[in-house]
Amino acid sequence: MTVRMDKRFADLRAENRPALITYFMGGDPDFQTSLGIMKALPEAGADVIELGMPFSDPMADGPAIQLAGQRALKGGQTLKTTLDLAREFRKQDNATPIVMMGYYNPIYIYGVEKFLDDAIASGIDGLIVVDLPPEMDDELCIPALARGINFIRLATPTTDGKRLPAVLKNTSGFVYYVSMNGITGSALPDPSLISGAVGRIKAHTELPVCVGFGVKTADHAKAIGAVADGVVVGSAIVNQIAGSLTKDGQATADTVPAVTTLVKGLSTGVRASRLAAAE
C-alpha cells in the first residue's frame, strides 16, 4: 500500500467505519468542472477517490458511465489530462487516496513506464484495470507494485475458491468486490449475500474488502457499509452529473453542488452503517 492508502484505511478502522469510495469520470463534462467535482469530494465525505480514465470501448461499463466517457472524450480529455486532474488536486489535498480506474489500452498506448512515472508524479495511489487478469500481471501489475502503486483487483460472485487465490496474489490496497455479474449501474443485490461473499474473500486476505455496483442511495450505502470495509459509488454520481447538464452536455452552475449533495447523503449513510449493524 502507499502511505496515503495505508493511513486512510488505518484511520477508518480506528473510527470503526467503512470507507466511502466515490467514482467519477475524468473530464466529464469538461476538465475544469471535473476538477471542481474532485476538489469537492473529500469535504462532502469521500474517503477515497476513483478517477475514471475515459476510453472509447468500455466493455464493463453500463450506459451512464459509457456516456460519461463519451462526453469526456468529446471535450478533449486524454489519459494525460486525467493525470493532470490528479496533479492539480494534489496542490490542495495530499491526504485523500486517488485510484485511477479504466482499461489497459490507453495505458499501453501511453507507454507503461511513462504512465507509471507520471502517475507517481501526479500523486496516484492505485490502479484498477478491469481488463487485465492475473495471467497478465507482468504487463502492468508487477511494474506498478515495484513502483509502490497499489494494484486493486475485482472479485465477483463467480470468483470461486479455486480462482480467488490467483486474483488476490498480487492485489494490494483493497479488494473491490463487484456485488453482481453484469455491467455497472445494475440493481443492488441482497446485503446478506454480500456479507457471505465478503466473509469468503476475507478468509483469503487481510486487505480491506470494498463493495460496489448498484449503490445509489444513503440507505444502500448504510446497508453495504454494515458488512463491508468500504462502499463504492459510481453510476449514481455519474448520473447526478448528467442530470445537471444542459441539453448539449455542458456544465451548469448546479453540476458541482448536485454531486456534493449526493455524496454528503451517501456519507451520512456510510457513517451510520456500523451503528445500524450494532443494534
Curated annotation (Swiss-Prot):
Q: Which GO terms describe its molecular function?
A: tryptophan synthase activity
Q: Under which EC number(s) is this enzyme classified?
A: 4.2.1.20
Kindly report, in one word, the top-level EC class recorded for this enzyme: lyase
Active-site residues, record numbering mapped to chain: E50 (proton acceptor), D61 (proton acceptor)
Q: Which SUPFAM superfamilies match?
A: Ribulose-phoshate binding barrel (SSF51366)
GO CC annotation terms, alphabetical: cytosol
Q: Which domain of life is it from?
A: Bacteria
Keyword Lyase included in the entry's annotation: yes
Q: Which InterPro entries match?
A: Aldolase_TIM (IPR013785), RibuloseP-bd_barrel (IPR011060), Trp_synthase_alpha_AS (IPR018204), Trp_synthase_suA (IPR002028)
Task: Provide this UniProt record's keywords sorted from A to Z.
Answer: Amino-acid biosynthesis, Aromatic amino acid biosynthesis, Lyase, Tryptophan biosynthesis
Q: In which pathway does it act?
A: Amino-acid biosynthesis; L-tryptophan biosynthesis; L-tryptophan from chorismate: step 5/5
Question: According to its UniProt record, which reaction does this protein catalyse?
Answer: (1S,2R)-1-C-(indol-3-yl)glycerol 3-phosphate + L-serine = D-glyceraldehyde 3-phosphate + L-tryptophan + H2O
Q: Which is a Pfam family this sequence falls into?
A: Trp_syntA
UniProt entry tagged with the keyword Transcription regulation: no
Family per record: Belongs to the TrpA family.
**Record HAMAP family:** Trp_synth_alpha
Assembly: Tetramer of two alpha and two beta chains.
Q: What does this protein do, in the record's words?
A: The alpha subunit is responsible for the aldol cleavage of indoleglycerol phosphate to indole and glyceraldehyde 3-phosphate.
Q: What is this protein called?
A: Tryptophan synthase alpha chain
As recorded in Swiss-Prot or TrEMBL, the protein's gene is named trpA
